[in-house]
Amino acid sequence: MGKLGNWWKTLLAGGAGVAALAAVNASIQRRALEPDDSALGGEAKLFAWKYGQIFYKEAGLDNPGLPIVFIHGIGAGVSSFMWRKNFDDLAQDFRVLAFDLLGFGFSDKPPAAPYSADLYVELISDFIREVAGGRANIVASSLGASYAVRVADEHPELVNAMILNAPAGYDTMNTRPGMAGAAFYGLLQSPVLGTSFYNVMASERSIRDYARHTLFYDYRRVTSRLVAHLYATSHQPGAQHAIAAFMSGYLNCDMSAAFARLVQPMVLVSGKQDVSTPVAKMMALLNLNPRARLEVFDFCRVMPEQEHPEKFNALASEWFKQQTYTDQRAERAGTKYRVAGE
């Protein structure tokens, strides 16, 4: 009975531990506030996609020319909120649309969706076709920029010109997950242990520290409002599913070959002090395609659109107006598409 008694004690202790973790997870979920959806102006709308409702904001409907579609990156709490310092400003001259990727922000977060780079490439393509009018300019960041590159390569008729902020998938985040990734994904999707791991990773302290040390050069830009929004968004029901796929490697996107083939005019944007996607990597990527140019923002890490919004918005406005003029000139010449400089 001694060994049997010890086994039962261990089992009961383990069960109590799991129950305690479950209680903590439930408490965190209850305390999470609703994220703020008013950071971007315009009208809130829903796009009924095959895997769920996609939330987006739209403004500048009366402005002429092609629309700008904003595509955010991947991370806990990340959403179209990240474009709050750009959306309204550019809406003065352009029709602008910013949407939350499936699994993020206010979009649906189905647990059984096949979260992957392919899924997001398909979502972006469908959004441009069915919501943006069939052709658009794109502003995208990180892995979102990599997905945009694939869209522009696979469906060139959908994309006119792009601004790509530190696209991932060049020499990192470019491999498919193996058995270890699949096993890790299974662990992260477990109701108790996976949720507990996620809650630690997406705690207010973790979010604040990551933003201060990795995302922003000036830590003072990591405001309490920003941290509160990222935390609230990251703890909406189902928010862990897409992040589990990301951390397991399922959202990785090898975009080098696609980038080299692109015919659309594009600007690469990089923060001079960015350590995750340094300028040297952007220079190497630039060498793959002579149609691209590079703009480097000093005193900046990953978030030039937030650290230097005036400069970023001026760049975007000038660039897309230039490409719209080039496109209209090409149409008058009798060609449907034309690349600037040709």
Regions found by a protein language model. Give the residues of each.
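Alpha/beta-hydrolase fold catalytic core
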Residues: M1-I68, Q92-F94, G134, F320-E342
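Conserved hydrolase catalytic core segment
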Residues: G133-P177
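Conserved alpha/beta-hydrolase catalytic His-Asp/Glu region
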Residues: N174-G178, N199-A260
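Short beta-strand/loop motif that positions the catalytic acidic residue
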Residues: L262, L268-S270
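Acidic catalytic loop of the alpha/beta-hydrolase fold
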Residues: K272-T277, V302
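Catalytic active-site module of serine/aspartate enzymes centered on a nucleophile-bearing elbow/loop
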Residues: P290-E342
